[in-house]
């Protein structure tokens, strides 16, 4: 995921600089693994804003020259730094992980609901609900136009309803350009359950079986909360 925003005066920003995700068991290959390609992409760029810490949104941070300022949310920075530190234990990933950790030391941490100006482009960072905690969308003002870049989002998380109300409030301001994700566009009638429903199902299974083993992302805070609350509520009802 990479979006380029350039003003008529030449200010150029990127929203996300991610790597392709693996397809099943295969190794992920990306156009920007080639040094010449990423150098061409970054030519003239002054700032890069990351919406969240998933690898298809941040994956080339170590390849970015020091003169380009990289920005991410404070909690997202902690999460990606923790992930890269764990990668240093794998011999095949160690070298790149240390390069990434060095780059992360130079990151700027943006705050939610803050508007800042970079050259002649302004960006307001707005929190959204996603499986990555501290995910953000961006309200961008450039050349008299307004752009809403939603990043990845969902409405079935714990803060989904509030997030959609926020999006509606910005769309009501006559957005000129909407840039959004399309994760579910290729799926026919996807059946999604909410975190509340998942928590209830988990509690039922915990009541049914003596032992339960959970397999989920350790970086999905909503999901961890769902299983914690299911276990807590199950134990509370047994007292």
Where are these regions (language model features)?
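A contiguous, basic/glycine-rich beta-loop/short-helix subdomain that forms a polymer-engagement track
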Residues: 239
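His/Asp/Glu-rich metal-coordinating catalytic cores
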Residues: 1-47, 56-222, 226, 232-233
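Conserved G/P- and acidic residue-centered "switch" motifs that form tight phosphate/ATP-binding loops
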Residues: 52
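Short glycine/serine/threonine/alanine-rich loop segments
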Residues: 236
């Amino acid at each position: 995921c990479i979006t380029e925003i350039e003003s008529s005066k030449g200010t150029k920003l990127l929203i996300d600089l991610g790597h392709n995700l693996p397809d099943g068991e295969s190794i992920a290959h990306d156009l920007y693994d080639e040094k010449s390609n990423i150098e061409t992409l970054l030519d003239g760029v002054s700032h890069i804003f990351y919406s969240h810490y998933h690898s298809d949104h941040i994956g080339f941070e170590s390849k970015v020259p020091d003169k380009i300022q990289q920005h991410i949310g404070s909690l997202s920075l902690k999460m990606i730094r923790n992930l890269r530190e764990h990668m240093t234990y794998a011999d095949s990933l160690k070298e790149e992980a240390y390069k990434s950790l060095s780059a992360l030391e130079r990151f700027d941490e943006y705050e939610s609901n803050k508007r800042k100006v970079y050259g002649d482009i302004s960006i307001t960072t707005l929190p959204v609900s996603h499986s990555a905690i501290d995910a953000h969308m961006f309200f961008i003002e450039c050349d008299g136009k307004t752009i809403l870049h939603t990043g990845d989002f969902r409405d079935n998380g714990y803060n989904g309803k509030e997030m959609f109300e926020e999006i509606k409030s910005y769309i009501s301001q006559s957005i000129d350009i909407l840039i959004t994700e399309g994760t579910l566009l290729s799926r026919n009638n996807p059946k999604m359950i909410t975190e509340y429903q998942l928590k209830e199902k988990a509690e039922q299974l915990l009541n049914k079986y003596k032992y339960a083993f959970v397999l989920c992302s350790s970086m999905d805070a909503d999901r961890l909360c769902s299983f914690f609350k299911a276990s807590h509520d199950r134990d509370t009802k047994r007292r």
